[in-house]
Every structure is written in structure tokens, then in C-alpha cells.
């Protein structure tokens, strides 16, 4: 009878338990924060601005998903498979980054000519959301997920969300602050994703 090596390895079991707890704590935070921010944002920005935010964000997210083409999921799986071979996963990392850049560049060109390069009434918001697209290109959380280093991701995400929460209450005061709200959202993604690069193995 084949036995699961994880069940025989207390270190592996401990690692799985820690990763589960990190993710559980983060998911609880993700559920709680909207309970704090949503009533405030809805009251300050108003229904019309919330509609603009949701609409432009959904359009941008579509192009991000189109440009991603499952690259992150593929990268996570391949890194996990070769996590004990540094030379192999280092090469895979570079290949996936190049592939991600190429696919997102094609998606961005379509996005640019349809929503920015013209007289679109929401072009100012689409321009801000370019930062979200860039954030997606430089997102390497899939790499750390493949290496099962969830602590770095969870701590990064938690810190960024708390900072964003503070900035929302400090900077978003009236319905005229919709661009500020966009900037807080996009900048938090950008700085959160770029911070992971400092934790890459040497």
C-alpha cells in the first residue's frame, strides 16, 4: 500500500498547517474590510461614482484576464513541480515572466486603442487603471505559491490592505475624490506586487 509521504513527514504537515492558517487569517481580513469601507465609500462617493468605478474596473479586469491566459496558474504548477531544483525553477521563472509580459502587452494594445486613445468619457479612470495592468504583469505571487511560501504573500497582502484602508479614510472625503479612490486601488496593487520582488531567492 502506497503511503502519502506528507503524512509521514511532520515537517511537511506543519508547513501545510501554517499555510492554511495564514490563508485563513487573510480570508477573514478580506471579508471584514469591506464591511468597514463599503458603507463609507458608498456614502461619500455616491451611487453614480460607485457605478463608474465598478464599470471601468470590470472592463480592465476583463483585459487582464484575457492577457493572463492562465499563465499564473501554469507558473504556479510548474514551480511547485520543480521547487527542489533551483536551476530549473529559476529558468522557468524567467520564461514565464517573458510570456506574461508578451500576452499582457497584446491585451494592453487593444485596451489602449479602445478605451484610452479617443474621446471615451471615462478615459481618465482607464488611464489610472493602466497601473493595475502593470501590477498584473509584475505579479509574482504565483512563484511563491509554487514554492509554498504563503507567509510572504499573506503578510504583504495584509499590510497593503491596511494601508489602503487608512488612505481611503484620510484622502477620500467627497464625491470629487473618485480619482483619488482609483489611485489608492491601483497604487496599492502596484506597490504590493513589486514588494515581492525583494524576496526572490538569490
Where are these regions (language model features)?
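Hydrophobic alpha-helical transmembrane segments
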Residues: 130, 155-202
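Residue-level recognition of transmembrane alpha-helices
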Residues: 23, 27, 54-57, 96, ...
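Membrane-interface junctions at transmembrane-helix termini in multi-pass inner-membrane proteins
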Residues: 83, 133-157, 200
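Signature of the first transmembrane helix
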Residues: 15-72, 164-165, 185
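Transmembrane-helix boundary and interhelical linker motifs in polytopic inner-membrane proteins
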Residues: 12-14, 45-49, 63-98, 146-151
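Membrane-embedded alpha-helical segments of multi-pass transporters/permeases
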Residues: 35, 39, 66-69, 108-116, ...
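Hydrophobic faces of transmembrane alpha-helices in multi-pass small-molecule transporters and flippases
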Residues: 16-36, 40, 97, 126, ...
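Alpha-helical transmembrane segments of multi-pass membrane proteins
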Residues: 62, 66, 101, 112-113, ...
Amino acid at each position: 500500500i502506497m503511503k502519502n509521504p506528507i503524512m509521514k513527514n511532520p515537517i511537511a504537515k506543519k508547513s501545510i498547517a501554517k499555510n492554511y492558517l495564514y490563508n485563513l487569517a487573510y480570508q477573514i481580513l478580506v471579508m471584514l474590510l469591506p464591511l468597514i469601507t463599503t458603507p463609507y465609500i458608498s456614502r461619500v462617493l455616491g451611487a453614480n461614482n460607485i457605478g463608474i468605478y465598478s464599470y471601468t474596473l470590470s472592463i480592465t479586469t476583463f483585459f487582464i484576464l484575457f492577457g493572463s491566459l492562465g499563465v499564473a496558474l501554469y507558473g504556479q504548477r510548474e514551480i511547485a513541480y520543480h521547487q527542489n531544483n533551483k536551476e530549473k525553477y529559476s529558468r522557468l521563472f524567467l520564461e514565464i515572466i517573458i510570456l506574461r509580459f508578451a500576452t499582457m502587452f497584446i491585451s494592453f494594445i487593444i485596451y489602449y486603442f479602445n478605451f484610452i486613445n479617443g474621446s471615451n468619457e471615462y478615459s481618465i479612470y482607464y488611464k489610472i487603471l493602466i497601473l493595475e495592468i502593470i501590477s498584473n504583469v509584475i505579479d509574482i505571487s504565483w512563484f511563491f505559491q509554487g514554492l509554498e511560501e504563503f507567509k510572504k504573500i499573506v503578510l504583504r497582502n495584509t499590510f497593503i490592505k491596511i494601508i489602503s484602508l487608512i488612505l481611503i479614510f484620510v484622502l477620500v472625503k467627497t464625491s470629487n475624490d473618485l480619482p483619488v479612490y482609483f489611485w489608492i486601488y491601483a497604487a496599492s496593487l502596484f506597490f504590493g506586487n513589486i514588494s515581492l520582488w525583494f524576496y526572490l531567492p538569490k
